[in-house]
């Protein structure tokens, strides 16, 4: 335990997003002047991992070179995992999911007392598209209470974006190690092998998975050169490796939504040095620099985008990761909570800690909601009535102690059968809007509005 604590304290990272990094656990382990020499330093094997096709445009091309004690190919044949994992989906159809336009909300999933690791505790909520066709996404959740023992997970289907809500994640990857706390996120790109330990025991969180794309920083447009998530705040691991025999070590590979296992006699985390721009990374959401309206109206949630996975259509995302962090609310003559909305995009929301400004109760940390394409949603009755009651006392206020987030996609998700049959599904969610009453009156127009309509266009005071 003391050794693990020391490792946590001494962990070092490299800063930047999309950088070409280089890292050595032993000085001189990286070859000079070429990627694949006849003999690598220290007798290592050279192995490339490609995150894009070889002929992808240079500005989009992602790959890394790993210099390892033994190559990844040294394993027994893959076999279907027994017992099969029946709650992971990457091909969404009527056999495993169904469409549902109703507003959906789930209470936090209980973390079981019986031993369960990240792989067995991972289950799909909803998604669209297909990992086979390299287009789509899946949203999962996980509950776990023990680390992965003598095993590593590899997702051949797509990239994972991990959002821990309870409990830290100690993630060992082929590029090094990451410690990810609630309030931080981690991205594990397609194909990387990783193992998750749980320093705090019980753990719960959310996972977004994308097929056929990678996350990137959103364009800032008129915001300028700075703001939102800064490149310098993304952290990649530094090289670290394990050597020696590990009999019966298991690689668990997710392939087409199914799990397969292969045995080998060494740890996959035997990379002594590496270089490239295809790497796992983490980000602290507290470092996000939010923007907001400073005079009137409520800004669109896109101003809080941390990462985006684009489609071929400009401005349309396969998946956006958006947060709702602490911030000042100062807009005048404005309904400050999120507005009522019907969206051509589908919105899955989660809550890491605190409370969400549009829901007075019922939306809990570790819970989730789904508002699909063109399904109406917005503040609950309590929030609306409390807000309009303060019409004459709208001083600037600060949202504190909260961190909600949203996965937003242009694709329409199908919801897994078990998610719709879950005991944690809130069947009374719709009740939070039933109390919204009509305030319409032909004679109670606001005096300010009356005066403004009586003025001539362009007239001064």
Curated annotation (Swiss-Prot):
Example of a GO cellular component annotation carried by this entry: plastid
UniProt cofactor(s): Fe cation
Record-stated family: Belongs to the homogentisate dioxygenase family.
Keyword Acetylation (UniProt): no
Top-level class of the enzyme under EC nomenclature: oxidoreductase
Gene assigned in the entry: HGO
Known pathway: Amino-acid degradation; L-phenylalanine degradation; acetoacetate and fumarate from L-phenylalanine: step 4/6
CDD domains documented for this protein: cupin_HGO_N (cd07000)
Annotated positions binding Fe cation: 341, 347, 377
UniProt keyword annotations, A-Z: Dioxygenase, Iron, Metal-binding, Oxidoreductase, Phenylalanine catabolism, Tyrosine catabolism
Protein name: Homogentisate 1,2-dioxygenase
PANTHER family the UniProt entry points to: HOMOGENTISATE 1,2-DIOXYGENASE
Molecular-function GO terms, alphabetical: homogentisate 1,2-dioxygenase activity; metal ion binding
Keyword Metal-binding annotated: yes
Enzyme nomenclature, EC number: 1.13.11.5
Gene Ontology BP term (one): homogentisate catabolic process
